[in-house]
Amino acid sequence: MIRAILTNAALCLSVFLYSSCQSGDKNSLILENTTGLERAGELIVLKKDWLENKLGKISKEKYVVVADKEGQFATVQYDDLDKDGAWDEIALLQSFKPNEKKSFLLSIADQPATIKAVVRAHARHSRKNADNTFGPDLMMDSIPAAQPATDFTKQAYPPFLTEGPAWENDKTGFRLYFDVRNGKDIWGKTTAKMMLDEVGTDTSRNYHQLADWGMDILKVGTSLGAGALALAVQTNNGKDSLIRLGGVNMGKVYYEKICDGPVRAIIRLRYPEWKVMDGIDAVNVTDEISIWGGQYFYESKVTVNNAPGDSKLVTGIVNLYNHAINKIDTAGSAIAYTWGKQSENKDNLGMAIVAAANDIETISKLPEENKTVTNTYTVTFKPSLKKEVNFRFYAGWEKSDDAFKTASGFKDFLVNQAVLKKEKIIIK
């Protein structure tokens, strides 16, 4: 939606903001980058109770607007995370020079600021209509156990647009196969525009081939693809086994969109009926996926309940071309990554999983004798963390950014990302 800033109001606000921030007024917001690195697209999230400590009580129908010292309003997203009809957090994106400090004014308003907002993050999921068009974007959906994968030899269109939920930002994109495969795939993007409402709606335009916006750049097969999930367990016969979150035993799956653009998008996938093996109760898994503008990753927060006591949560990176798995331990993060000619466009693609170093037990190549998951480098989390795990999955395609054209460029990028992950923007 395009709106115009009211110039006179902005000029008046600019004068007030300058004096307020100079005097340390409670209405001021200070953001500081304490690193010597540039930071692009930093997500700033301010909870409502934190804002009320500064501004006083904020009634349900009111908003908080954010303006810089020139009176220019920031694009702010108001997210109702608990679905009670009132926003709980505001989210905005800011970029910083090395060691830069920024000052803003916070104000309670009757409505959001009237500005031109560029959408930098989006999630969508829609079902196919009888006429082979696709319906509206769904806030909630579910599939039964044993939802089959699409057989494109028998039907031109899948039951869901691009076979399931997709999430993107202005740099990259991802999707989930909403069926028994339950795999995660990568959209390589060459445009900042949101494209995934259009991709896949016309079968004459093959998204496996390079287009002006990009393409599907990953072959997943029976691997863990781009950060799919599995559980390492000891089976009833005492053998260690890796059981993917997929197949008939995955049970019913629930999809919910939590929030959507212009700043960030969050979706939640629930798997409450996963029969990991015979003789135990169903395991309950929730995968909450976030993406925001300016980044080459999605972030996954996984919670697991009722898992066997000795089990370990596992995620992974597809390994179809036998590129080496590289490991870096830096700035409190463990990084597992591959790089090389492994995109479906036959050019360079870097993929990485980044998580807290203290959370990871092993990074390894999956043995070839494993049958339920194949061609995968695995990241196994410590057993003590099976109730909640956080990780980021990165996709660095050379057509998205020249930094990813070389192995050293991708490595340097990941090392810097670990520093930025550790050294948060100071908010006060």
Q: How does the language model describe each region?
A:
Residues D212-W292:
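Extended, loop-rich substrate-binding clefts of extracytoplasmic carbohydrate-active enzymes
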Residues M1-I30:
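Bacterial Sec-dependent N-terminal signal peptides
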Residues K60-D88, M277-I280, Y321-Y337, N358-E369:
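Solvent-exposed beta-strand/loop surfaces of large extracellular or lumenal domains
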Residues P112-G246:
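Solvent-exposed N-terminal domain segments of exported/luminal and surface proteins
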Residues G24-A146, T150-Q155, T162:
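Alpha-mannosidase-like glycoside hydrolase catalytic domains involved in N-glycan trimming
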Residues V285, I289-I291, Y296-T330:
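Acidic (Asp/Glu-rich), glycine- and aromatic
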Residues D82-K97, V354-K428:
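Beta-strand-rich recognition/accessory modules
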Residues G24-T34, L313-K365:
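Polysaccharide-binding surfaces and accessory modules of carbohydrate-active proteins
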